[in-house]
Amino acid sequence: MNKQKLKKFFDNREEFAPNERLWLFCMLMSIAGFWGGFTYSLRGRVFVNAQTGNLVFLSLGIASWDTALIKNALATFLAYFLGIITAELISKEINKVSFLIWERILLFFSLIVTICLGFIPETAPFEFTNFSIAFTAAMQFNTFEKAHGMGMATPFCTNHVKQASAYFVRFLKTRDSSKLRISLSHLSMILSFITGATLSIFLGRFFLGKAIWLSSVFLVITLYFFSKSLKNYKARKLK
């Protein structure tokens, strides 16, 4: 794959709006992986991005009457639930004001959240961090739903594993390059998640809660290039 094809693979400007480009989803996926590794390794061993594991932890806490586990898992679940509701209620109304302004607001909000979380002392209850991240991740999940025409989830990997493997088999059967492209797109999401999670766990050993600030750096980069691509997209539309 040459440089031009690789650029189109991640940033197909001709066919898709700025909020539907694969590079953006890979960045959000690496941030989600970072958050998942951070909360699991440093903040009570909960999963902020996907709630299936937390419901298992909640059930385990109830069965063993571990109140700390119940409280942590339940707070994360409720935060995720509220994040979905919040994004669903306000995103479309806000975007009526200006094209994709909600997406920019959400990225900026995510940045502020992660910066603030880095100042929380290690002795603070885990719920402060887990609630904030779960709420933010849920809003991202509800807001960024499609990349390059494909349904994409930004906080977790289960569907990406299914799609990457299923479309690879379909490619082998048909030799249809579009199916290989879909498989590789989902695989890039998985690799992005692994990269983010690995970085957070590694850096957390040295910087503890301050490690969350690396995800702030990722968000600054994402917000900058998203705003830039939006500006270019609007300029092309006016021609």
PLM region descriptions:
Residues 2-239:
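Alpha-helical transmembrane segments of multi-pass membrane proteins
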